[in-house]
From Swiss-Prot:
This is Vitamin B6 transporter TPN1. Gene3D superfamilies: Hydantoin permease. Residues 1-98, 144-157, 220-221, 296-302, 384-394, 443-519, 567-579 are cytoplasmic. It comes from Saccharomyces cerevisiae (strain ATCC 204508 / S288c) (Baker's yeast). The gene is TPN1. Thiamine-regulated, high affinity import carrier of pyridoxine, pyridoxal and pyridoxamine.
């Protein structure tokens, strides 16, 4: 009986092997046939198309060989991240270089020069608003280590697969707007120290191209370069404090524009407040990008404090200097002439002028602060473009960095003679959308991911049986009870932390939220922008109540409108769709 069973088993195995051989033979034949058909189509296609494809393939291989970062918007898994404490030092250097530069100082100049505020009024307005902006940027940064995703990729958990594209577009406009401003300022500086021997457009090209050459390589190179640049740049700013100190007696000579009534002065104070808030708050759209290599169990408080102090201290350091220079220019005629002739670059050269040749060298060093800021903008903007469609995501990040550089260069060349107008009217608008994004993220984390996690049935499906890995995270109720932990951290022998996001589903359309609640709240927030903004092209009815030029309160109204609408809409969305 046993022998019969063995014979039967052998016949079944022979039959199975025969069937497998037939299937493999069929698949090989089909693959060969498909390859022949594809080859015939390629051979029959126009020769120009073949040359383009071959050239693109050759270029990609060359770029990869140069060590350019190939990772796009893909999540960095816990296994691929570092554990060295040097990462904290490098990121601290990154923030010192990126935020302690002329791009931050440029907005502070407008307190006295554009809004007619005294030095004391400008200091009070700017320091309070910058602090609030840094708090928002720091809060957004905590999404980086826990997710391993770029900032705008994490926004998919708020806005869903489709609507996040609108947020990504706003992020692109924001960071590229700063790049345009930086390029123009760099051109003005080079023109000022060369007595116009270096035309403004040439300086713009130099700053833009230098930024691109670093940004194309990837996050590791970006962080290293930013760290190295922070030392000479901050040293140059310290020297500018010293060099310009002989004119500080003119600071108090200018009080404020005497032709402004009390209401208009308050409105200008509020508009300058919103402008300075935008300087640091807009970092919230990309801060998480630079923490994706940190261990997944990095304490939130460490990331928050590193980002807050890393952006607050350098911004205030250069901002106060900018207010001093601008206040002197309002009372001291030679500096005023330099500003009228060469913009911010002329004002910086005036501060260094008594040091002659060494002063020119210091101005050139300060140009690197603009390059530092543009490097980050160009690097992060590419990821937002990849979020716009599946097709764009398949195109390497370095290609989109080239596109961003070209766009920045063209816009800077076109708007180079209208710097103050661009800066005063454009930058506050960047702060509008980040205010709405922040309040939605804050409420999602504080309310729904903490108290209503059981409603996320798509993201945390109920699991019966043993949990075997990252694909099975467990039910949301188990997560709330701390019954389910992060399997990755157990394997890496780090401190166990609990999930409140299923980050493994970052690109799963069937799991990610539809984004109806966040998008509707965002649209309602736009209504707050319309009634509260005070710009040259539009003054809202609420903003118009503050003087002749209005007072910009759009950021706070948009945040309030979105914050009130989102909770009930999000609750209904979770109850209806489970995601």
């Amino acid at each position: 009986m046993n022998r019969d069973n063995m014979d039967t088993t052998k016949r079944k195995e022979d039959h199975t092997k025969h069937t497998t051989d037939v299937i493999e033979f069929y698949e090989e034949g089909t693959a060969a046939s498909s390859l022949n058909i594809a080859t015939e189509k390629a051979n029959s296609s126009p020769s120009i198309l073949r040359r383009i494809i071959n050239r693109a393939a050759w270029l990609s291989k060359k770029v990869d060989a140069m060590g350019v970062e190939s990772t796009g918007i893909q999540r960095i898994s816990p296994y691929e991240r570092g554990t060295s404490k040097k990462q904290f030092l490098h990121v601290a250097g990154l923030w010192l270089s990126a935020t302690g530069g002329l791009s931050s100082m440029s907005s502070f100049l407008l307190g006295p020069l554009l809004f007619g505020l005294s030095f004391r009024e400008s200091v009070a307005s700017s320091l309070i608003s910058v602090t609030i902006g840094c708090l928002i940027a720091a809060y957004c940064s905590i999404m980086g280590p826990q997710s391993g995703c770029r900032q705008m990729v994490t926004a998919r958990y708020l806005f869903g697969w489709w609507f996040v594209k609108l947020v990504a577009l706003a992020s692109i406009i924001g960071v590229m707007g700063w790049s345009v401003v930086n390029s123009v300022v760099g051109g003005e500086m080079l023109a000022a120290i060369s007595n116009d021997k270096v035309p403004l457009w040439v300086g713009i090209v130099i700053v833009t191209v230098c930024s691109f050459l670093v940004a194309i390589f990837g996050i590791k190179q970006v962080i290293k370069v930013e760290t190295y640049l922070s030392v000479p740049v901050l040293t140059a700013f310290l020297l500018l404090y010293i060099s310009s100190s002989d004119k500080y007696s003119f600071v108090n000579a200018y009080v404020s524009k005497g032709n402004l009534d009390s209401s208009t002065r308050k409105g200008n104070w509020m508009s300058f407040f919103s402008l300075c808030y935008s300087i640091t708050a807009t970092w919230g759209s990309i801060t998480a990008d630079y923490y994706i290599l940190f261990p997944e169990d990095t304490p939130y408080i460490q990331i928050f404090c590193l980002t807050f102090f890393g952006t607050f201290l350098p911004t205030c350091f250069v901002g106060i200097l900018g207010l001093l220079l601008a206040s002197v220019a309002m009372s001291y005629k030679p500096w005023s002439v330099e500003y009228d002739s060469h913009g911010m670059g002329g004002l910086l050269w005036a501060g260094f002028q008594r040091w002659n040749g060494f002063g020119k060298f210091c101005v050139v060093v300060l140009v690197f602060s603009l390059v530092s800021n543009n490097i980050i903008n160009t690097y992060s903007a590419a990821f937002s473009i990849q979020l716009s469609s599946v097709f764009c995501a398949k195109i390497p990040r370095w290609f989109w960095s080239i596109v961003c550089t070209i766009i920045c260069l063209v816009c800077a060349l076109i708007g180079r003679n209208h710097f103050s107008t661009i800066l005063g009217n454009f930058l506050p608008m960047i702060g509008y959308w980040i205010s709405m994004y922040f309040i939605l993220l804050f409420e999602e984390n504080l309310v729904f991911r903490r108290f209503f996690l059981h409603l996320y049935t798509k993201e945390f499906p109920t699991v019966t049986g043993e949990i075997n890995g990252p694909e099975l995270v467990g039910s949301s109720k188990e997560v709330e009870k701390d019954a389910v932990t992060n399997i990755h951290l157990l394997k890496r022998k780090h401190k166990v932390t609990k999930h409140r996001y299923n980050w493994d589903k970052w690109e799963d359309y069937e799991v990610l939220t539809h984004g109806y609640a966040a998008t509707f709240a965002f649209i309602v927030g736009v209504a707050g922008v319309v009634v509260g903004m005070a710009q040259a092209y539009w003054i809202g009815p609420i903003a118009a109540k503050f003087g002749e030029y209005g007072g910009d309160v759009a950021m706070w109204l948009s945040m309030a409108f979105s914050g009130v609408v989102y909770p009930p809409c999000r609750y209904l969305e979770l109850r209806k769709f489970g995601r």
